[in-house]
């Protein structure tokens, strides 16, 4: 089923008789019918945050995509949580979107995951002029939640760009990228492994078992023999990835 968003665009007004033009920023309902591969939201409990765990989880999705590109649509798409203040209040919802729904935010959000048809029924089809909205709403259109900024920055570094689509409920931005243009996908290489002890593992990066049935990723030290085209890893890494000597590993 199509996904429903607001799309931010420019509406051009022109009067030939008065000889003037004016550009207006507007939001209008937008049905996203084209296929895409959507990245889900990652939530880590506070006790497990830090030490690169969040970025490892996020990057592992791109590493899986690089190993199995035929399973995905060429375009990757992600929604980012919209801005809320320190009191957990959404200006976009409180001062704009909730006027269209006889629901609280969480109920509307819950229903939208099951069936978003009610959004098309509830919101007028004409464009909304942004400069007529409350200032505090204007300032947060397409602005990520403070807790989502690390994920937003990470995605931007992986060539994801805002596409003008805005979440209907919280005003959060949507980003997209061609999977083939994601740096972690472009840099992926496969090599057979050898398990080594007492050598200088002089490189550091993502190492993956690319198997569809046993996919796993670590970020660890390794070494590479350029002449033999062989990856040297420790027994600890091999065990974590369920790899045996001669198995193929992917490095990014």
Show which residues each predicted segment covers.
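Conserved acyl-donor/pantetheine-binding loop and adjacent beta-alpha core of acyl/acetyltransferases
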Residues: 1-41, 100, 105-113, 117, ...
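Conserved acetyl-CoA-binding loop-helix of GNAT-fold acetyltransferases
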Residues: 22, 41-44, 49-65
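Conserved GNAT acetyl-CoA-binding A-motif
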Residues: 33-42, 62-81, 91, 138-142
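Glycine- and acidic-residue-rich phosphate-binding/metal-coordinating active-site segment common to enzymes
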Residues: 57-58, 70-111
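Aromatic-anchored, glycine/proline-accented short structural segments
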Residues: 92-144
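Anionic-ligand-binding alpha/beta catalytic cores of soluble enzymes and soluble regulatory domains
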Residues: 129-199
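Short conserved beta-strand and strand-loop elements enriched in small hydrophobics
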Residues: 203-210, 246-252
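Short beta-strand-centered segments at strand-helix junctions
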Residues: 214-246
């Amino acid at each position: 089923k199509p996904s429903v968003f607001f799309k931010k665009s420019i509406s051009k007004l022109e009067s030939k008789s008065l000889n003037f033009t004016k550009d207006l920023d507007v939001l209008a309902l937008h049905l996203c019918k084209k296929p895409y591969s959507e990245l889900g939201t990652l939530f880590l409990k506070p006790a497990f945050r830090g030490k690169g765990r969040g970025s490892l989880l996020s990057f592992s999705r791109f590493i899986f995509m690089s190993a199995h590109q035929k399973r995905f649509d060429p375009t990757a798409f992600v929604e980012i949580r919209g801005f809320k203040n320190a009191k957990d209040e959404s200006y976009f919802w409180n001062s704009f979107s909730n006027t269209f729904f006889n629901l609280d935010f969480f109920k509307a959000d819950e229903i939208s995951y099951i069936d978003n048809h009610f959004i098309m029924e509830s919101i007028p089809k004409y464009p909304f002029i942004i400069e007529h909205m409350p200032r505090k709403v204007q300032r947060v259109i397409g602005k990520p939640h403070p807790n989502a900024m690390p994920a937003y920055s990470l995605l931007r570094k992986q060539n994801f760009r805002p596409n003008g689509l805005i979440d209907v409920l919280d005003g959060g931005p949507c980003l997209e990228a061609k999977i083939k243009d994601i740096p972690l996908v472009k840099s992926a290489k496969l090599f057979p492994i050898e398990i080594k002890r007492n050598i200088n593992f002089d490189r550091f990066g993502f190492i993956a078992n690319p198997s569809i049935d046993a996919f796993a990723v670590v970020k660890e030290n390794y070494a590479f023999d350029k002449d033999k085209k062989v990856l040297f890893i420790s027994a600890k890494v091999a065990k974590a990835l369920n790899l045996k000597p001669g198995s193929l590993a992917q490095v990014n």
